[in-house]
Each structure stands twice: as structure tokens, then as C-alpha cells.
UniProtKB/Swiss-Prot annotation:
Function: RNA chaperone that binds small regulatory RNA (sRNAs) and mRNAs to facilitate mRNA translational regulation in response to envelope stress, environmental stress and changes in metabolite concentrations. Also binds with high specificity to tRNAs.
UniProt name for this protein: RNA-binding protein Hfq
Domain Sm: from-to ranges: 9-68
Family membership noted in the UniProt record: Belongs to the Hfq family.
Matching HAMAP family: Hfq
Swiss-Prot/TrEMBL GO biological process terms: regulation of DNA-templated transcription; regulation of RNA stability; regulation of translation, ncRNA-mediated
Species, as recorded: Dichelobacter nodosus (strain VCS1703A)
Sequence segments annotated as region (Disordered): 78-106
Gene: hfq
Lineage: Bacteria, Pseudomonadati, Pseudomonadota, Gammaproteobacteria, Cardiobacteriales
Signal peptide extent: none
Length: 106
């Protein structure tokens, strides 16, 4: 599993399992809103009133509507001492994610 997948999959899966409403910003500036129904290596199924298949290559940013918590263990990552480090991201007033705990990478 590549390093980019080791963060992406657990993050999307947590959003899916917890049914967190998200805003997905596309590279062309369009904002989509809904809940992540499913995803694979290439697409995200987003559900609002209807289901939409969104190609990942068109996605710029995914912003959750509330805090989510991912531990490094869930992401398959550990620090140098082998200890678990957690990261929590909170959307700010502008809807951008801000780290509110330990950064994932130094």
C-alpha cells in the first residue's frame, strides 16, 4: 500500500462509517455536499438527495462538517518510538481543515 493510500483510505472510511456530512470542492471550484456512501481507488460515491459518482482526480479538498479523529494506528503509522500519535482536524470558519493536535508529519 502506498503512503498516499495509507492516509486517504482510513480518512474516507471514517467519514463514511460515522456518516459525517462533507463538502467536496472540485478543482473547477464547484462545491458538492453530502455524505460519503462508498469509495474506491478512483471514485467517491456522494449521497445527498441523489447519489453522485465523483472522480477523485477532480477533487481538490474534502472538508468534514465536524471533528473526526484518526489515530496513527488506524492509519497504519507510528512515530519513531513506535508510539501511537493521534491527529484531529477541525473545519475553521472558512471551511478549511486545521490541525488541532499533533501534526501527522514533522
Amino acid at each position: 500500500m502506498s503512503k498516499s493510500q495509507s492516509l486517504q483510505d482510513p480518512y474516507l472510511n471514517a467519514l463514511r462509517k460515522e456518516r459525517v456530512p462533507v463538502s467536496i470542492y472540485l478543482v473547477n471550484g464547484i462545491k458538492l455536499q453530502g455524505q460519503i456512501e462508498s469509495f474506491d481507488a478512483f471514485v467517491i460515491l456522494l449521497r445527498n438527495n441523489i447519489s453522485q459518482m465523483v472522480y477523485k482526480h477532480a477533487v481538490s479538498t474534502i472538508v468534514p462538517s465536524r471533528n473526526i479523529h484518526l489515530s496513527r494506528e488506524e492509519m497504519g503509522l507510528e512515530d519513531e518510538a513506535g508510539e501511537e500519535i493521534s491527529a484531529e482536524y477541525t473545519p475553521n470558519a472558512e471551511g478549511q481543515a486545521e490541525a488541532t493536535a499533533d501534526p501527522l508529519y514533522d
